[in-house]
Amino acid sequence: MAVYTDVSAASLSDYLAAYDIGTLVSYHGIAEGVENSNFLVQTTTASFILTLYEKRVDPADLPFFIGLMQHLAANGISCPQPVAMRDGTMLGTLAGRPCAIVTFLPGVSVRKPTAANCGQLGRALAQLHLAGAGFEITRRNALSVSGWRPLFEAAGPRTDTVHPGLAAIITEELAAHEAHWPAALPAGVIHADLFPDNAFFLDDTLSGIIDFYFACNDLFAYDVAVCLNAWCFEADGAFNATKGRALLAGYQAVRPMEAAEVEALPQLARGAALRFLLTRLVDWLNVPEGALVRPKDPLEYLRKLRFHRAVASARDYGLAA
């Protein structure tokens, strides 16, 4: 979450009049994240999250995001619920941006996940994959392998200003993945961005999942690979196989992976690291002036990518033989 677009108290109060959720008491921007402008809004009835969808979000995708949260909640996943206006509309416009209000999900994210946290996350991810079955709207993953070269081109010659030799590494990775990216694996709705700040815990129990604005249809095992990258590395860049083992065991307890998924996991994890390296690189080089946003270090994912390049099999991630 982040804030790129400011909202005045007067305009927000006027906007809330279209809802039956009380009147504005207070609000403030949320700096975490990188994609949209988000505000915690307190009204006379409850707390809510207001999201303004910024220019990188295609308005045509918004019905997918809104509908998916409704579908997942109806199928047992704890996630924010879109709030309808009095006329039943879920999407509005504020400060020149498409926007939506969703319910506030209680809980806190963990900054240093434990193996137990990772195990719960694995189970929740598998439950999400199963719950997505039957959701009729689809959205392609614009940040899968076909979208990585355009990101690299957007960074352009400035790439090596972030790290000497980075452009050559990315060029090599793109060639490898474009030639051999797995395709014929189980697929469906995935979260695609399930980092620790998008999972909430209460009393060490996972209480919900948020931020579905990268969700799409893609390989389930790719979503697992994203989570291995996001949850199982330590601050010094070392992969924690105990956490990896817990995450994978939690996932497999709910949705056992096929042999082909297990075999593809090293390449999927390597590709996921490249994806976040590239998006962080572009964001790092293009922070809007005055935006309340903390760009994330792309080199964190260069270090992870180097680990994945040395992986021999899924056993290196802690997967039981």
From Swiss-Prot:
Catalysis performed (reactions): L-homoserine + ATP = O-phospho-L-homoserine + ADP + H(+)
Q: Which UniProt keywords apply?
A: Amino-acid biosynthesis, ATP-binding, Kinase, Nucleotide-binding, Threonine biosynthesis, Transferase
What the entry lists under Pfam families is as follows: APH
- Top enzyme category: transferase
- Protein name (Swiss-Prot/TrEMBL): Homoserine kinase
Known PANTHER family for this protein? AMINOGLYCOSIDE PHOSPHOTRANSFERASE DOMAIN-CONTAINING PROTEIN, AMINOGLYCOSIDE PHOSPHOTRANSFERASE DOMAIN-CONTAINING PROTEIN-RELATED
Its GO biological process annotations read: threonine biosynthetic process
Q: Which domain of life is it from?
A: Bacteria
What is this organism's lineage? Answer: Bacteria, Pseudomonadati, Pseudomonadota, Alphaproteobacteria, Hyphomicrobiales
Instruction: Please name the pathway.
Output: Amino-acid biosynthesis; L-threonine biosynthesis; L-threonine from L-aspartate: step 4/5
* Protein family (similarity comment): Belongs to the pseudomonas-type ThrB family.
UniProt-listed Enzyme Commission number(s): 2.7.1.39
Extract the GO molecular function terms from the UniProt entry: ATP binding; homoserine kinase activity
